[in-house]
Amino acid sequence: MKKIVLLIVSLAAFAFGADGEMIRSYSVIAAGIGLGLAALGGAIGMGNTAAATISGTARNPGVGSKLMTTMFIALAMIEAQVIYALVITLIVLYANPMLG
């Protein structure tokens, strides 16, 4: 936990030392935290999806192929949410609409 706090504080210091603009530095911090949370949520969702598919296949091996197809569709939808977060993060970092 101490390493994570140290990393966040050091990134905040790096962000605040750039130009002195508060909006830009807050955007960098928010982008990092937002993308990290999106990736964390996506990873948890993918893990739960895979665990449920493995459990379902173990209980009834006959429906394994149907479960795999459904799992891949679900994984694509979960990953799409993380990609949307990445796109929003890149917009906030490089074409920040709050800077005017």
From Swiss-Prot:
Pfam families: ATP-synt_C. F-type ATPases have 2 components, F(1) - the catalytic core - and F(0) - the membrane proton channel. F(1) has five subunits: alpha(3), beta(3), gamma(1), delta(1), epsilon(1). F(0) has three main subunits: a(1), b(2) and c(10-14). The alpha and beta chains form an alternating ring which encloses part of the gamma chain. F(1) is attached to F(0) by a central stalk formed by the gamma and epsilon chains, while a peripheral stalk is formed by the delta and b chains. GO terms for cellular component: plasma membrane; proton-transporting ATP synthase complex; proton-transporting two-sector ATPase complex, proton-transporting domain. The gene is atpE. It is found in: Cell inner membrane. It is a multi-pass membrane protein. Belongs to the ATPase C chain family. This is ATP synthase subunit c. The record marks E79 as: Reversibly protonated during proton transport.
